[in-house]
């Protein structure tokens, strides 16, 4: 899959470039492309190859393609090659994904079928981000339950938390017209936690206790959640321009918003407000469900799979190529050896490799480092690419007390240093704090492939769902519209798709 806008230096091509020379010279691996396609045509071309069983020996595929390759029995197990050839670093990345990752890269016999590039676990968890300074102005505690959140949102709308005498504040921000109420994994400005509080997981395929697959958007729990969210909108507590405005960042950065939802990296989203010292944003697992637990849907453990066809005689080459990338990529960047070359465009089987728990590890190390429990030389940085620079920056940017990450305890004197590092440090130390310090119940998608009927009917079903949810939330339709939506969804291909997914999931048991 080639980026059509890739900048390829003069005299080089995809088939003839520095990276391929290195692999030939250092590993005696001769990389030959079966075909080259731009990113936009790549999936189509790969799907054709899968359909006609003319796949390359080694390839980088997405989740849907991987499921299809497994289903049609076109790829070989690579577990023994993994044991013998994967470097310690590659193994540590794969192991960091734990059981959730193992489940998706193994076939029903438990054999490893793919080399994954793990997704960062924290990226799939949406939390409540809230203006701590507004809470302080109004003498309120950070809300944790649904009812507390409602009371705080009401105060944010009605009690002039910014003290400007104007009635111009938004309690809970929502998605703009190009965003989503519910997403898969991380969903900035979405309302996912408002649904999970009722154990509703729209857009996810759930397995019930007896192993039956159910689509999360059509459950009774989702009906309950929609009615509750519609109530917030009717009471003026959710952005009145939800799903209409062009950009939800606008009111946010204008200082008009008290609460929004999103993943750990939203420290970057509020970065400008932090750097201007205008807003103290903190993150919480809110709202808790009635049983006091925080339920959250998770991102897929990986969306990038490197696989070997049944015909491939040397699957170990894939491990050697990936080991080499992991070992030397940072060095190439630091030394300028590959300047002008885009590794992601030209390196074969390229993926970004990270630890699934990278952000939690970073939080833990930075916290211990600030507390004087570890020194800068006590950490193995070999698989933690950014941690050393984080540690160096945090000592200069953090004021005492070292365990309080409120706005006033950051140091803003060195503007350049703050600009470069603070949004990231806030993302880790504020955004990831709930994930490290509190329990949560992770809910995974049971199916991330694509069935036959999905090809023809899924986009219409998705449109029906999103339009219905939007109408119910904004009061253009009553909650009874949910029941007719479910009927229509089932009759228009939903039941058919559910059965196809059930068959696939049963096969994998």
Question: For each predicted feature, which ranges?
Answer:
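Conserved N-terminal structural module of periplasmic/extracytoplasmic solute-binding proteins
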Residues: 1-149, 193, 213-215, 333-335, ...
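General small-molecule cofactor/ligand-binding pocket signal
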Residues: 30-36, 240-241, 282-284
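Carboxylate/His-rich catalytic cores and anion/metal-binding grooves
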Residues: 63-100, 104, 153-156, 165-205, ...
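Short, solvent-exposed loop/beta-turn-alpha elements that line the ligand-binding surface or hinge
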Residues: 77-97, 141, 202-220, 289-296, ...
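Helix-loop-helix "hinge/cap" segment bordering the ligand-binding cleft or interdomain interface
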Residues: 79, 107-186, 207-256, 306-341, ...
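Polar, glycine-rich mid-to-C-terminal structural blocks
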Residues: 227-230, 279-288, 294-375
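Conserved small-residue motifs centered on glycine
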Residues: 330-467, 476
């Amino acid at each position: 899959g080639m980026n059509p806008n890739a900048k390829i230096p003069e005299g080089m091509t995809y088939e003839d470039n520095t990276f391929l020379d290195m692999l030939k010279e250092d590993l005696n691996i001769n990389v030959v492309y079966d075909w080259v396609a731009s990113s936009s045509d790549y999936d189509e071309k790969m799907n054709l190859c899968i359909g006609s069983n003319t796949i390359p020996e080694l390839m980088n595929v997405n989740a849907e393609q991987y499921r299809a390759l497994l289903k049609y029995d076109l790829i070989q197990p690579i577990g023994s090659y993994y044991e013998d050839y994967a470097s310690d670093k590659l193994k540590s990345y794969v192991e960091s994904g734990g059981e959730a990752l193992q489940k998706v890269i193994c076939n029903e016999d438990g054999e490893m079928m793919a080399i994954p590039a793990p997704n960062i676990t924290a990226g799939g968890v949406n939390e409540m981000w809230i203006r701590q300074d507004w809470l302080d102005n109004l003498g309120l505690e950070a809300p944790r339950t649904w009812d507390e959140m409602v009371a705080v949102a009401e105060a944010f709308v009605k009690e002039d938390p910014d003290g400007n005498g104007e009635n111009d504040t938004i309690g809970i921000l929502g998605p703009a017209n190009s965003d989503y109420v519910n997403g898969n994994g991380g969903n900035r400005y979405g309302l996912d936690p408002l649904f999970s509080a009722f154990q509703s997981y729209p857009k996810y395929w759930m397995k019930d206790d007896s192993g039956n697959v159910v689509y999360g958007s059509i459950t009774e729990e989702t009906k309950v959640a929609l009615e509750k969210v519609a109530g917030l909108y009717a009471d003026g507590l959710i952005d009145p321009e939800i799903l209409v405005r062009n950009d939800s960042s606008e009111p946010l950065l204008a200082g008009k918003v008290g609460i929004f939802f999103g993943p750990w990296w939203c420290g970057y989203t509020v970065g400008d407000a932090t750097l201007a010292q205008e807003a103290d944003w903190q993150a919480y697992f809110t709202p808790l469900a009635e049983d006091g637990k925080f339920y959250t849907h998770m991102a897929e453990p990986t969306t990038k799979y490197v696989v070997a066809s049944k015909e491939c005689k040397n699957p170990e080459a894939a491990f050697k190529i990936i080991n080499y990338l992991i070992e030397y990529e940072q060095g190439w960047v630091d030394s300028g050896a590959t300047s002008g070359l885009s590794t992601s465009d030209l390196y074969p089987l390229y993926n970004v490799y990270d630890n699934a728990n990278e952000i939690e590890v970073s939080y833990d190390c930075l916290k211990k480092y600030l507390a004087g429990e570890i020194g800068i030389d006590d950490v193995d940085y070999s698989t933690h690419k950014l941690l050393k620079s984080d540690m160096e920056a945090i000592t200069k940017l953090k004021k005492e007390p070292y365990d309080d990450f409120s706005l006033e305890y950051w140091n803003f004197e060195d503007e350049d240093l703050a600009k470069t590092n603070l949004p990231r440090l806030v993302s880790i130390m504020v955004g990831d704090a709930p994930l490290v310090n509190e329990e949560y119940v992770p809910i995974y998608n049971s199916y991330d492939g694509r069935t036959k009927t999905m090809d023809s009917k899924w986009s219409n079903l998705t449109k029906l769902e999103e339009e219905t949810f939007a109408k119910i939330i904004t009061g253009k339709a009553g909650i009874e519209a949910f029941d007719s939506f479910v009927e229509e969804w089932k009759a228009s291909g939903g039941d058919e798709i559910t059965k196809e997914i059930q068959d696939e999931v049963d096969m994998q048991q």
